[in-house]
Regions:
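Short, compact, well-ordered microdomains
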Residues: 72-124
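Short linear proline/tyrosine/threonine-rich motifs used for host-factor recruitment
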Residues: 122, 129-131
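Solvent-exposed, flexible loop/coil segments flanking beta-strands in beta-rich domains
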Residues: 1-16
Length: 140
């Protein structure tokens, strides 16, 4: 039987393929950067129950809702991870900081709600987006 690369192990656990040849089972922890309200997405290692890395980076500029710069400096596979797991799309915009060009991604709110519902409630409430969530619940 041929072994295929898994990208998702259950509803809330994803596989992060490292450039070092290892795979980690990770879950998302969604928060908000205090200085500008941008979405912050951290990865937690499910096997070791500790932080794995931060998918996003705070470059001080406020971005549109659900958008954040991706930390390709410390997590070079971050863009592949986002695409493989259908977490968001590249906006075409980048910001330079030092010698690094950080891509701006718009994250899929529905997908993030599925993977980290509590974090998204806090993020959306902090951004004043809770009306969208209420409208969705009313349709059910």
């Amino acid at each position: 039987m041929e072994k295929t690369k898994e990208t998702e192990t259950d509803n809330k656990t994803l596989i992060y393929h490292s450039c070092y040849g290892t795979d980690a089972k990770v879950s998302l922890d969604i928060q908000m950067y205090y200085s500008n309200g941008n979405i912050c997405i951290e990865l937690n290692d499910e096997d070791y129950k500790e932080p794995y890395g931060c998918l996003t980076v705070n470059l001080c500029d406020a971005t549109p809702n659900y958008c954040s710069y991706v930390d390709v400096n410390n997590m070079p596979e971050a863009e592949d991870f986002i695409v493989e797991n259908k977490l968001g799309v590249f906006t075409g915009l980048v910001k330079e900081s030092g010698f690094v060009r950080y891509p701006l991604y718009m994250f899929d709110a529905e997908r993030l709600r599925d993977l980290c519902p509590d974090g998204m409630i806090v993020y959306e409430k902090g951004k004043g987006i809770q009306a969208v969530q209420k409208q969705k619940e009313e349709k059910r």
